[in-house]
């Protein structure tokens, strides 16, 4: 048996995913600060962290667009 969610319930789920992504982005930004603070920062690690942030921002944009359709 499948349950049909209302748009409001779906929007709440999407909003929570967006919030989780925002936490992840903040965490990655702190990791960059930490890496830049060491004697010899690893530029590859910083680059990878920035790539991860870019991917998360793309996911956040997609979810934000989905949230807009659910709220319309």
Predicted regions and their residues:
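Charged, low-complexity interaction regions
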Residues: 4, 34-46
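Short, charge/polar-rich alpha-helical segments
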Residues: 1-30, 34
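A general, composition-driven signal for non-globular sequence regions
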Residues: 4, 11, 39, 53-54
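Short, intrinsically disordered, low-complexity terminal segments
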Residues: 8-9, 34-37, 58-65
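Amphipathic alpha-helical coiled-coil segments
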Residues: 24-28, 48-72
């Amino acid at each position: 048996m499948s349950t049909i969610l209302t748009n409001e319930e779906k929007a709440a789920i999407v909003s929570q995913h967006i919030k989780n992504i925002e936490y992840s982005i903040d965490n990655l930004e702190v990791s960059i600060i930490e890496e830049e603070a060491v004697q010899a920062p690893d530029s590859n690690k910083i680059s990878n962290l920035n790539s991860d942030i870019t991917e998360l921002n793309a996911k956040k944009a997609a979810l934000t667009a989905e949230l807009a359709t659910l709220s319309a």
